[in-house]
Each structure stands twice: as structure tokens, then as C-alpha cells.
Amino acid sequence: MSHIFDASVLAPHIPSNLPDNFKVRPLAKDDFSKGYVDLLSQLTSVGNLDQEAFEKRFEAMRTSVPNYHIVVIEDSNSQKVVASASLVVEMKFIHGAGSRGRVEDVVVDTEMRRQKLGAVLLKTLVSLGKSLGVYKISLECVPELLPFYSQFGFQDDCNFMTQRF
């Protein structure tokens, strides 16, 4: 199975108290067939992304810098990806040529919410980020989710602006 990053890097950061039917692992190339894109569409517009385009983007992300650490939770009962979040690590010249982490695309399937899968993903990514030596991890969220993310050490830190095209 082709993963987006080395699974052994992730293993020490996965909480041990997961139910047996949930497996935390890096995104795999065959997750297209396990509903990964459908899961992302619960978060935002995915656009026209067929399997060929997914696999092409997967390979580009797998081999590029910054490093994309996309983590999924698979339900072994249904063989579906039911939750996902990404830690993007970008290199900087500031902070002694340090690296910054950004948590992105946090999503839990609507039918699997309230099972603390989002918490599992965030704890995993924060632990992974620390081990990778990032000097900070940031994320953007809607105001309603500030209390949720603050449970994991995130603080409302500054204004965020965007341009969409």
C-alpha cells in the first residue's frame, strides 16, 4: 500500500485507546475507493476529482516539500475512511531556519461524529508536529469551533484574511 508519508513516523503518535474497528494511518493511494473524496466533500467543495486526478495529486504531494502529513481514520467494519486531517510542514528562514506546521482539512463523517475522532486526529497531529520539530502549529477555523480547538492547546491568536479565486 502506497502511503503519502512513512507510516512508521506516525505510529508513536497514535493514541492507544481507540476502539478496535478504527485504524489511524497515513492517507493511502487506494483511499479514493474508500470514500476519501466523499468525506472531504462534507467539509468543502472538492470539484471534479476523478481517480486519475486524485492519484496524480497524491504522488505530487507525496514527493514534495513542504511535507504533507495527511492522516485518516478507517473504519474496518465498513472499509471506509471516516475522518481525516492534514499537517502541512513548511520550511522557513525565520526561527533559525525552522519549520512551521499548519493543520488543515479536519473532517469527520457526519455519521461518525461525537465519537472523539476529531480529538484523536488533533492529538496525533500535534504530537507528530512536535516530533518533527515545528516551532508552531496553526489552523484556521470558524468562530464556533474555537472552543473545540482550544482543548488541544490552540489559541485565538490573530486576524486571518483571505482572497478566493
Swiss-Prot record:
Acetyl-CoA binds at R114, Q115, K116, L117, G118, A119. It catalyses: D-glucosamine 6-phosphate + acetyl-CoA = N-acetyl-D-glucosamine 6-phosphate + CoA + H(+). Gene3D superfamilies: 3.40.630.30. Residues 22-165 form the N-acetyltransferase domain. Keywords: Acyltransferase, Transferase. One of its GO terms (biological process) is UDP-N-acetylglucosamine biosynthetic process. Substrate binds at T44, K92, F93, I94, H95, E104, D105, V106, Y135, K136, R164. InterPro entries: Acyl_CoA_acyltransferase, GNAT_dom, GNPNAT1-like. Pathway: Nucleotide-sugar biosynthesis; UDP-N-acetyl-alpha-D-glucosamine biosynthesis; N-acetyl-alpha-D-glucosamine 1-phosphate from alpha-D-glucosamine 6-phosphate (route I): step 1/2. CDD domains: NAT_SF. Its EC number is 2.3.1.4. GO terms for molecular function: glucosamine 6-phosphate N-acetyltransferase activity. PANTHER family: GLUCOSAMINE 6-PHOSPHATE N-ACETYLTRANSFERASE. Belongs to the acetyltransferase family. GNA1 subfamily. This is Glucosamine 6-phosphate N-acetyltransferase. It comes from Caenorhabditis elegans.
